[in-house]
Amino acid sequence: MPAISRDEVAHLARLSRLALSDAELDEFAGQLDSILNHVKVVTEVAADDVPPMANPNAVTNVTRPDVIVPGLTPEQALSGAPAVEQDRFAVPQILGEGE
């Protein structure tokens, strides 16, 4: 006996707002039954003695060492700015007063 019936597929199709023909209902019932059987096999294979893992690859974070490098001086950083006020980038106001 299939795990999922044609009526259940029709119900799922209605919930999904899919218009399926009778042939499609029969086809999808068979496909979903096959999928559920494969899932059942996988759940039977999964053993309690196998620890769960988030990633099958044994990859660790590869980071570079922190090295202090000189940054830009304020003058260098502001040299390309179209407008500067009090050693800061000047930008147009986008919010009104009190917002």
Curated annotation (Swiss-Prot):
The reply on keyword Nucleotide-binding is yes
Q: Which InterPro entries match?
A: Asp/Glu-ADT_sf_sub_c, GatC
> Which EC number applies?
6.3.5.-
Q: Name one GO biological process term.
A: translation
The source's domain of life comes to Bacteria
- What are the protein's GO molecular function terms? asparaginyl-tRNA synthase (glutamine-hydrolyzing) activity; ATP binding; glutaminyl-tRNA synthase (glutamine-hydrolyzing) activity
Here the disulfide bonds are none
- Reactions catalysed, as given in the entry: L-glutamyl-tRNA(Gln) + L-glutamine + ATP + H2O = L-glutaminyl-tRNA(Gln) + L-glutamate + ADP + phosphate + H(+); L-aspartyl-tRNA(Asn) + L-glutamine + ATP + H2O = L-asparaginyl-tRNA(Asn) + L-glutamate + ADP + phosphate + 2 H(+)
* Sorted UniProt keywords: ATP-binding, Ligase, Nucleotide-binding, Protein biosynthesis
What Pfam families does its record include? GatC
Record keywords: Nucleotidyltransferase included? no
What role does this protein play? Allows the formation of correctly charged Asn-tRNA(Asn) or Gln-tRNA(Gln) through the transamidation of misacylated Asp-tRNA(Asn) or Glu-tRNA(Gln) in organisms which lack either or both of asparaginyl-tRNA or glutaminyl-tRNA synthetases. The reaction takes place in the presence of glutamine and ATP through an activated phospho-Asp-tRNA(Asn) or phospho-Glu-tRNA(Gln).
Family recorded in the similarity comment: Belongs to the GatC family.
Quaternary context: Heterotrimer of A, B and C subunits.
Q: What is this protein called?
A: Aspartyl/glutamyl-tRNA(Asn/Gln) amidotransferase subunit C
User: Where does this protein come from, organism-wise?
Assistant: Rhodococcus erythropolis (strain PR4 / NBRC 100887)
Gene name linked to the record? gatC
